[in-house]
Amino acid sequence: NEVAETAQKKGIALTGEMTNYLHSLDSTRPVTCGINIFFNFLSSIGLGVYSDDKAEKSAENAEKFAAEQAKKAAAAKPEKKKKPVGSEFYNTLACLVGDYFMKCGATLYPCDLKTRDAYANMDIAGYNYGIFRYKHDLKKYPNRLILGSETFCKDAYSFWEIAKKNKRIIGDFVWAGWDYIGEVGDGAAEYSDYKFEDPSTRMTGGNGRIDLNGKPRAEAAYTRVAFERETGPFIAVDPVYQKEKLRLTGWQLTKALE
C-alpha cells in the first residue's frame, strides 16, 4: 500500500513478480495493490519519496550511514528533525493543502504515466484517493477493474453513485474504517489555542468511522446512508461551541457524535 516503487522500473517489474507468485499459491484470488496515484507522480520528480537512483545510493552508503548513526548515538546530541518521506510526506502535504487538491492532483496526465504499468501487472487496480479518475480510466482502459483502496469519508456518496453505474468499480475502502494507534493526529480536530505540535501528546490517528473502543461515530452513520444500507434519520451533535474555528484534516468529515 502506497509503495512508491510502483512508479519506477524495478518496482513495476517486482509488482509483476509478486502477482505471479501469489497466483502460484492460489490461482483463484485476484491480486491488487493500493497505489496513491498523485504520490507516484511526486515520487517520479523526487519529492520526498523513493526512486531507483536513491535506493542504489542508499545501498552503497549503508555502512557509512550506520557508522555515522553510531557516532551520533554515542555523542547523544539532538538531531535535526528529518523531512517526512513516504506516506508521512503525503499525509503532511494533504493536511496542508486539503483533500480536494490531492484528488485533483491525481487527475494530472503524468499520474497516469506513473501508474499504468504497475496496474497492468496486477488483476485489480487499487486507487488511493483517485476517485476523480474513475470515469476517465474506465473509458481509457476497458479491461481494468478498479478498487477504491483508500478514499476519504466524504466521498462515500460520490463513490456509490459511480459504482452503481459501473460494474468494473468493485469496492471501496475508506481510510480509516477503525481508528488505530499510529500516524497520530492525521484525522484529529484542533483549535488554534490547542495546536497539535508534539506527536507524543496523542496516541491514535483519530480518523476512524469507528473509534478505538469500537463505538461508531457519526461518520459511520453517514456512510451507511450513502451506501443505501440505512434510511435514517440519524442525529449527530457537534462539539461544544468554541470561539476558535475547529480545524479538520481531509481524513475527518466531522467531529459530531451520533
Language-model regions: role of each:
Residues 2-9, 206-212:
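Active-site rim elements
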Residues 1-2, 36:
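Short linear capping/connector segments at secondary-structure termini
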Residues 15, 20-258:
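Substrate-binding clefts and catalytic carboxylate motifs of secreted carbohydrate-active enzymes
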